[in-house]
């Protein structure tokens, strides 16, 4: 018989650096999950990912206090900041431009993120990434 699900916890955890401190500790502690067990398993599973990369994580907590988790690809903004070398996006979105990104670069990001995006094809995925780039204050240029 399948385990009964108690709930889901969505967190953004940096690869290879899960610790019992906030926000992980309190979020898991409220559900009675073994915090150190999660941290060790997460760090082991993400050791091949560049340390410090933010990974959206969905933790499924079961009634017997056991858990499973899924890590997704890093956010589009992480890839965009990596490509442009920016620390953050524009403070006044739409009014100021902080950098440029090419359509080819957008397509590369879309390929990496395809499995996590709600898009049927690469063109639709690239448009989603383009929207994120514009929201960050990046100018899209043809290349």
From Swiss-Prot:
Alphabetized GO MF terms: large ribosomal subunit rRNA binding; structural constituent of ribosome
Gene Ontology biological process terms, A to Z: translation
Gene3D superfamilies membership: Ribosomal protein L11, C-terminal domain (1.10.10.250), Ribosomal protein L11/L12, N-terminal domain (3.30.1550.10)
Domain of life: Bacteria
One Pfam family from the record: Ribosomal_L11
Record bears the keyword rRNA-binding: yes
UniProtKB keywords: Methylation, Ribonucleoprotein, Ribosomal protein, RNA-binding, rRNA-binding
Record-level GO cellular component terms: cytosolic large ribosomal subunit
Maturation and modification: One or more lysine residues are methylated.
Annotated TM spans: none
NCBIfam families registered for this protein in UniProt: L11_bact
Assembly notes: Part of the ribosomal stalk of the 50S ribosomal subunit. Interacts with L10 and the large rRNA to form the base of the stalk. L10 forms an elongated spine to which L12 dimers bind in a sequential fashion forming a multimeric L10(L12)X complex.
Record family assignment: Belongs to the universal ribosomal protein uL11 family.
Function: Forms part of the ribosomal stalk which helps the ribosome interact with GTP-bound translation factors.
Protein name: Large ribosomal subunit protein uL11
Organism: Caulobacter vibrioides (strain NA1000 / CB15N)
